[in-house]
């Protein structure tokens, strides 16, 4: 056989063997601690690793276990806590220690703590020590499957010592004893004290005092600045302690704007009250017919409101609106010339009683007539209505009183003159305008000549005055209206409430 052919066949066999080995190696899963992971995934997701390991090695029994990083734990690489059967199970890994170690140490530490959690959840942690036979059984099983090197204790001593930057040393005899030579090294600034479990033995055997000999650079300056910034006054600390002990809380005064019931400052002023009341009254008169009794009730309500709102400071309340208010009201609301529209109708500004077929010629009303009602006719007034005294006294809280008197003694209510009615003013204005212009009050709808029997009957007929509700002869109603309206204007003086 040709030698070249023999060499070629040998080379081919070697090549086939190598390819078979490569194929077998490719079919095998990559180890969890393979060095290639350091380049592919140097900082893996902790939650993703936990879920993957739980399904692969622990049959999904750790779904309710919590896993998280701890930024303050520097003494050990990881810890698993369990609150009892059916309680919370939590795994915490030290971020300060493991961030300085390769990815292999993170995977092995996580699997180590997951074995503890599995024993807790399955209630199989009956070993006297945490790393007994049950723990070692699962540890060897996972090491064979993954090629990892899970151990009982970690070897991160250099990293742990790196974070122990607060050193104390005893000045007693123990500073010459092995293995510590009187040193206490801690990651936190907590000096040795009675809270340490070995303190009692140290006091018996040594009795020395621990003196701090080392701390991180600029630690004292940082601590002083933080203390000054966070320092609170003694009063604030005492108040906080009182609140924690359940004592009475300090009362903080109210700094806003409050309202006191019954205070004069909280009630609207008298001028605003009367102005708004007059506008509302005028609106009501334009929409419906108000009777005299309804006006009296509103007047009583107004006086009561003023007395309740102003108990201490008496104010001068003017019942008459100002000229500007009168102009506004007159522009919006038409004038009514007859006070009682139910009993009278308007005929060219003169009140004519409803139901009469014809009336005599009316004489022009003279504002200067001074005619008194005879006592005999005053006795003929309607006795069915309740009469009130001729004067009413309104007393304020300060003791001031104002007497409102009437010219006519048969008024129905003592508060009638407190506010002038819009109908009375408009009736008086209409009569004065017609008198000044020289026009007569003769009705255009009635015949110009009246018979003698009709004039005699009109002179004898008695009617009620719409202002004072007094009984007056029909032929003298105009003069009586002038006198009543003029009397109301003179008697309505400012009063104190």
Curated annotation (Swiss-Prot):
Stretches with biased composition (Basic and acidic residues): 420-432
List of residues binding Zn(2+) 1: 112, 116, 131
Start-end of Low complexity biased regions: 383-404, 442-459
Location(s) in or outside the cell: Nucleus; Chromosome
Cofactor requirement: Zn(2+)
Residues with PTM N-acetylmethionine: 1
UBZ4-type zinc-finger residues: 462-489
Annotated knockout phenotype: Embryonic lethality caused by genomic instability. Cells display impaired lesion bypass, incomplete DNA replication, formation of micronuclei and chromatin bridges and eventually cell death. Cells show an accumulation of DNA-protein cross-links (DPCs). Sprtn-haploinsufficient mice are viable but show accelerated aging, characterized by cataracts, lordokyphosis and cachexia at a young age.
N6-acetyllysine PTM positions: 231
Entry note about domains: The PIP-box mediates the interaction with PCNA, while the UBZ4-type zinc finger mediates binding to 'Lys-48'- and 'Lys-63'-linked polyubiquitin.
Name assigned to this protein: DNA-dependent metalloprotease SPRTN
Organism of derivation: Mus musculus
């Amino acid at each position: 056989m040709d030698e070249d052919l023999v060499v070629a066949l040998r080379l081919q066999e070697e090549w086939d063997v190598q390819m078979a080995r490569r194929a077998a190696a490719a079919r095998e899963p990559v180890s969890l601690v393979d060095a290639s992971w350091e380049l592919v995934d140097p900082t893996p997701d902790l939650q993703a690793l936990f879920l993957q390991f739980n399904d692969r090695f622990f049959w999904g029994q750790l779904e309710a276990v919590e896993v998280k990083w701890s930024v303050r734990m520097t003494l050990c690489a990881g810890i698993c806590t369990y609150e009892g059967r059916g309680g919370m199970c939590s795994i915490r890994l030290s971020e300060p220690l493991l961030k300085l170690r390769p990815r292999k140490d993170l995977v092995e530490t996580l699997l180590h703590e997951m074995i503890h959690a599995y024993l807790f959840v399955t209630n199989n942690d009956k070993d006297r020590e945490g790393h007994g036979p049950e723990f070692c059984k699962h540890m060897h099983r996972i090491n064979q499957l993954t090629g990892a090197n899970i151990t009982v204790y970690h070897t991160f001593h250099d990293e742990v010592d790196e974070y122990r930057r607060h050193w104390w040393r005893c000045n007693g005899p123990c500073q010459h004893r092995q293995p510590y030579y009187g040193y206490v090294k801690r990651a936190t600034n907590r000096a040795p004290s009675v809270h340490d479990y070995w303190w009692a033995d140290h006091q018996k055997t040594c009795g020395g005092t621990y003196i701090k000999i080392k701390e991180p650079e600029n630690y004292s300056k940082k601590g002083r600045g933080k203390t000054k910034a966070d320092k609170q006054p003694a009063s604030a600390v005492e108040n906080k302690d009182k609140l924690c002990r359940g004592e009475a809380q300090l009362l903080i005064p109210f700094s806003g704007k409050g309202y006191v019931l019954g205070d004069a400052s909280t009630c609207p002023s008298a001028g605003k009250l009367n102005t708004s009341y007059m506008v509302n009254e005028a609106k009501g008169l334009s929409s419906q017919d108000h009777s005299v009794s309804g006006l009296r009730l509103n007047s009583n309500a107004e006086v009561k409101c003023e007395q309740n709102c102003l108990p201490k400071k008496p104010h001068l309340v003017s019942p008459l609106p100002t000229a500007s208010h009168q102009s506004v009201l007159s522009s919006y609301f038409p004038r009514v010339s007859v006070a009682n529209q139910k009993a009278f109708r308007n005929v060219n500004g003169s009140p004519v009683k409803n139901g009469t077929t014809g009336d005599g010629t009316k004489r022009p009303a003279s504002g200067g007539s001074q005619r008194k009602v005879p006592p005999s006719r005053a006795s003929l007034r309607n006795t069915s209505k309740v009469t009130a005294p001729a004067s009413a006294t309104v007393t304020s809280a300060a003791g001031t009183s104002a007497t409102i008197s009437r010219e006519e003694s048969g008024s129905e209510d003592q508060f009638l003159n407190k506010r002038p009615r819009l109908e009375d003013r408009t009736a008086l204005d209409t009569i004065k305008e017609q008198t000044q212009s020289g026009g007569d009050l003769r009705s255009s709808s009635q015949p110009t000549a009246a018979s003698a029997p009709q004039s005699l009957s009109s002179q004898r007929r008695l009617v009620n005055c719409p202002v004072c509700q007094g009984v007056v002869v029909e032929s003298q109603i105009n003069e009586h209206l002038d006198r009543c309206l003029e009397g109301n204007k003179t008697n309505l003086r400012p009063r104190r409430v």
